[in-house]
Amino acid sequence: MTLSINNEFVWEGIQVKVSLPSTYDPNQIYPAILLNDGNLDFLSSLSESVILVGLTSKNRLDDYTPWKVAALRDGAPAFGGQANAYHDHLFGGLLDQLQSLYRLDEARLGYGGYSLGGLAAVYSLFSFDKVSCVFSICGSFWYPDFVTYCKEENVKNLDCLLYLQNGQTEGVNHSNRLAQAPV
């Protein structure tokens, strides 16, 4: 199924794509899903009942990572550790903008992604409580010190549902720190 994109705009460096249900009624409220990396086609089966919001950051290696870390290999860019600033933009201003444009059900907001996008979503649980569901598909939990951080820090969003999905062979074919991906 091909999604129809009803609105596209840039909010503080984040490319935003919005797909409304085809029967969108401005007098009704709708659950919404915010998806890092913006590939809404993964969620197309939900498109008739949910507002889908694709988010594409300017630099995913910076915006989806919690702290600075060296590159995985020589010649590759380092990880910038700007997830807090990204989430400040997302939950501080962009979410308000979306709520002014569309009828979002504040009690049914989901946020997630895959790989680094999933890492960022899980990391948001420790500082923000704006969403009721967080999901991570093959989240980059190999990220240095992330598992330790999760064990030692307090979660702020205690009422949030959390869905994690990882493959059983995460990191198997890597010779760098990706090989340390938790299963």
Model regions: which residues?
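A domain-start/cap signature at the N-terminus of enzymes
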Residues: 1-30
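Serine-hydrolase catalytic machinery in alpha/beta-hydrolase-like enzymes
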Residues: 11-14, 28-103
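Active-site-proximal beta-strand/loop segments in catalytic clefts of secreted hydrolases
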Residues: 35-38, 55-58, 114, 137-139, ...
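Active-site loop->helix "elbow" adjoining a glycine-rich segment at hydrolase catalytic centers
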Residues: 86, 115-118
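Alpha/beta-hydrolase fold nucleophile elbow
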Residues: 103-114, 134
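Short glycine-enriched nucleophile-adjacent loop
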Residues: 118-128
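A conserved short beta-strand
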Residues: 130-141
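The feature captures the conserved acid-bearing segment of alpha/beta-hydrolase catalytic domains
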Residues: 141-183
